Amino acid sequence: MSVSGELSVANGKSTPPKSSISDYIALLKPRVMSLVVFTALVGLMVSPVPINPWYGFLAIICIAVGGGGAGALNMWYDADIDAVMERTKKRPIPMGKISPPKAFIFGMVLSLLSVLVMGSFINWFAAFFLAFTIFFYVVIYTIWLKRITPQNIVIGGASGAFPPMIGWAVTTGAVSLDSFLLFLIIFMWTPPHFWALSLFSSLDYEAAGIPMMPNVRGEYSTKKQILFYTVLMVLCATAPCFTGLGGVFYGIFSTILGIIFIYFAYRLWKANTHDETILMAKKTFFFSLLYLAAVFGALLIESLVRYFIDL
């Protein structure tokens, strides 16, 4: 403890920790934002309409800022449960580094700014789509679904699946079947990803009173549904090959990754003991991160190769 902190305690006063730039960055959920930005970038790059690089860069910044604003609003509302969970109790609001009102204002300013800039400089369709995504994540998922149903991340997961459609809308001013397929891949990926996490974090969620699938339906039902959604996800990931969005490289690569993902999900489903379940849940969770990045990365690589071949 610092000298000033000791004097404050001695005088019967506690000095709240000072906030820093890193605390405000933490409010943005940078790890989540990085996935949002990457999938949005892929949606933008694989769309059939070219865009000025500077406008594309500005659009991605808007999506990142909007995603960060939504993350801050999520932390503002979830401050009570974040303080209970081991995984989240060191976030800025539970630690007292940023007050809830400041977090709320920060999140609202970023959210509104991102939408206004997107509409003013890119197009209003993409801006309204971004606004709807922020609303869906904060209101539909965080405020409404998260604390009342084990299907929270199934329905609420749509908010995390919208970014590639926003990226697509940036260049085209519309949505299409191909952009919807990108949405479906992430939408089906979300349950296996988060339910695997909830299997080895079930005590944390239980302490916070969040009705995640393992706490409500049990381990076996959760593992079975992880396998079910994994198969659906892999099928959705092959669909771009039939529309022309994905080529031979993407088709082979995504299929191999999909088989590996199904293998992990199957091993998790067949796990006989709790310890084995936890081990396989962790492996499935971490592979899911690699899978989504690799599948979207393959689409991006193919798009860039086609671009340079056509030059």
Curated annotation (Swiss-Prot):
BP-aspect Gene Ontology terms: heme O biosynthetic process
Gene3D superfamilies referenced in this protein's UniProt entry, alphabetically: UbiA prenyltransferase (1.10.357.140)
Matches recorded under Pfam families: UbiA
Primary enzyme class: transferase
Pathway: Porphyrin-containing compound metabolism; heme O biosynthesis; heme O from protoheme: step 1/1
Keywords associated with the record: Cell inner membrane, Cell membrane, Heme biosynthesis, Membrane, Transferase, Transmembrane, Transmembrane helix
One annotated Gene Ontology cellular component of this protein: plasma membrane
Known catalytic reactions: heme b + (2E,6E)-farnesyl diphosphate + H2O = Fe(II)-heme o + diphosphate
Family: Belongs to the UbiA prenyltransferase family. Protoheme IX farnesyltransferase subfamily.
Job of this protein: Converts heme B (protoheme IX) to heme O by substitution of the vinyl group on carbon 2 of heme B porphyrin ring with a hydroxyethyl farnesyl side group.
HAMAP family: CyoE_CtaB
UniProt protein name: Protoheme IX farnesyltransferase
Organism (species): Bartonella tribocorum (strain CIP 105476 / IBS 506)
